[in-house]
Amino acid sequence: MSQISAKDVKDLRDKTGVGMMDCKKALEETGGDMQKAIEYLRKKGAALAAKRAGREASEGIIAIRISDDNTSGVIIELNCETDFVARGDDFTGFAAAIADLALENGIASAEAMMSLKLGEAYGNESVEDSIKTMTGRLGEKIDLKRLSLLQTSTGIIASYIHPGSQLGAIVELATDKPAESAELARDIAMQVAASSPIVVDRSVVPAENIEKEKEIFRQQALSQGKPEQFVEKIVTGRLEKYYQEVVLLEQPFIKDSNSRVQGVLEEFARKNGAAVSVTRFVRYQLGA
């Protein structure tokens, strides 16, 4: 067996991020051949990934990337098994690399990411193979759970990520004054993250949701002994409160609870002589 130098072990560690003892073993197993040692570690990572495939990966982080011109944005959820790994530089750096690659290539789903190749820092492997390698490096199941992309040619994309990186949102505003709308867009992203709306406008609340809520409100009123002739009025009132919870434009504004989001948009438009509206949003909460 050839002599394995400390420098070779360090070089392999720098190339792969794997622990020193594992790097030494890989070099010993491959007769000191650096490329074969890298392949050995990749195979070991793939084997561990297969072994841990059935494990639950419920920890992790949300990562967001926005283009320099604020016309594209990506949000991802990358999972692992423990909070300890989720907070580590290797894991957070990996999430950032995936989000950067998705933004650069305009990828809109986790599935479409798998064949794309990450950079030299990840051995120019595909995302799919890099996930296996990272599983071997960190000793936990790693999973790219979901990914969403927003793009606009008529407005601005903005984001908010809550401290701890377990909650985040990206939003698209249609506006003829994107630069002036940047702060407003960030506020709306914070609103989405904090208040968890399900739609922008009440007109697109799914009909089945409305009927389900109305039936719940109706049964609640009857079980409380409300006179039947007043039940429909009660249902209507409670439905309005429901809209204020789930419809973004009807929610109390997070920075001023006396104003609604719709009113904030209208006031901004009036003051700035701008056309502005919320087109869509994506909100991710870890595990939700």
Curated annotation (Swiss-Prot):
Q: Where is this region: Involved in Mg(2+) ion dislocation from EF-Tu?
A: 82-85
The reply on keyword Acetylation is no
Task: List the molecular function annotations (GO) for this entry.
Answer: translation elongation factor activity
Q: Which domain of life is it from?
A: Bacteria
Q: Does the keyword Membrane apply?
A: no
Q: Which UniProt keywords apply?
A: Cytoplasm, Elongation factor, Protein biosynthesis
Localization recorded for this chain is: Cytoplasm
Q: Which PROSITE patterns match?
A: EF_TS_1, EF_TS_2
Q: Which InterPro entries match?
A: EF-Ts_dimer_sf, Transl_elong_EFTs/EF1B, Transl_elong_EFTs/EF1B_dimer, Transl_elong_Ts_CS, UBA-like_sf
Instruction: Spell out the PANTHER family in the cross-references.
Output: ELONGATION FACTOR TS, ELONGATION FACTOR TS, MITOCHONDRIAL
What job does this protein perform?
Associates with the EF-Tu.GDP complex and induces the exchange of GDP to GTP. It remains bound to the aminoacyl-tRNA.EF-Tu.GTP complex up to the GTP hydrolysis stage on the ribosome.
Under which name does UniProt file this protein?
A: Elongation factor Ts
- Organism of this sequence: Prosthecochloris aestuarii (strain DSM 271 / SK 413)
